[in-house]
Amino acid sequence: MYCNQCQQTAKGVACTTRGVCGKTEDIQSLQEMLIYGLKGIAAYAYHCRVLGKRDEQIDAFVHEALFKTLTNVDFSTEDHWNLIMRSGMINYRAMELLQEANTEFFGDPTPTTVFTGVRKGPGILVTGHDYLDLEALLKQTEGTGVNVYTHGEMLPAHGYPKLRQYKHLVGNYGGAWQKQKTEWAEFGGPVLATTNCVLNPPESYKDRLYTTGITALDNVKHIERDDYSSIIEHAKRIGDLTERQGINIPTGFHHRAVLSLAPQIIDAVKTGKIRHFFLIGGCDGATPGRDYFTQLAEKVPKDCVILTLACGKYRFNDREFGTIEGTGIPRFLDIGQCNDAYSALQIAIALSKAFNVGVNELPLSIVFSWFEQKAVAIAYTLLALGVKNVRMGPTLPAFVSPNNWKYIQENYNWMPIGDVDEDLKAMLGN
């Protein structure tokens, strides 16, 4: 443990074995777990507010949970676990509210394919998660000759009818966040960063990087949504970007789009044409071992469906997965951003109702890649909903103490990722 939040901290530095207050390593871990989950909830609640949505129960829970972590308020292990489970349900509500806001503003996403190259003409790259920022830029660039490209978690924007209607939203350039220093340098045009994940830029593109909204970097230009003229003029000054070849990748498989195929999917499962569903998704990152998710997706049998979400999809979304034989059902379904875990859960819940079984009895395996605190909040949502047998990687969270991880293992049978072939065999029940 490492706790230095009160005046009595050991040696004026930190308590590292047991708190002067009586706090144990496991309580310190539970409080960190709770705080990191709250950060994820805050991100989704912030996006909701930007779109005019708010739920008092979310705000009230954040206040209560933070108060619980104050010095000498709560030393109960059971109470902390209850709070973490409640945080999972609060995050579920935040994701639900954000889904409502996104679809009210931009329409229900529908499946589409997105070009991954660069077209002739000036262009701006938009990264992050904020669709309202993207829409504002699209409105302000309409008729200017400046093309707009999405990056990273903005890819699902192409599925929304209100955003897709802009003809100068021409494609998606680059992959997940950790490659930005190379990809943004190569892109050549200005980049607009709306939320995470943005890194401190090298000189190669620092003068072309703009932040907006909640995002900020030292010595990088910050502009507001109501006036993007400076980045638009910058794109015009740079002029035509270097054309690049690309492929078309799929997105837009919102739960309503997927559930419109429910009769065909149910029939395909009953007739044995679909053997299993794999949800392989979450955050991407630079840590070695993330090629596990690529290998797993590539080795999933052809009679199985892969669902994905968040930037972890970039590990394999450039592959051609085709369709389930004899059905026309796509084998690869990109559900959307990390917050669209809500959509993935709606699909699982609908299937469980259709087959009259619990979610844990479905032919469904969840393989969860994580990086930051929104993924932590989603993990708590899965736990709160009682979802078991989840594989998590590439490493386990350092802030979860051995005893707390043991609790998760014993009660939910969560486990770290292992050998791809052995894991796949176990998930398929072979």
Predicted regions and their residues:
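Long, charge-patterned amphipathic alpha-helical coiled-coil/hairpin "stalk" segments used as oligomerization
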Residues: 383-384
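Metallocofactor- and cofactor-centric catalytic cores in central/energy metabolism, strongly enriched
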Residues: 1-351, 356-370, 375-379, 390-430
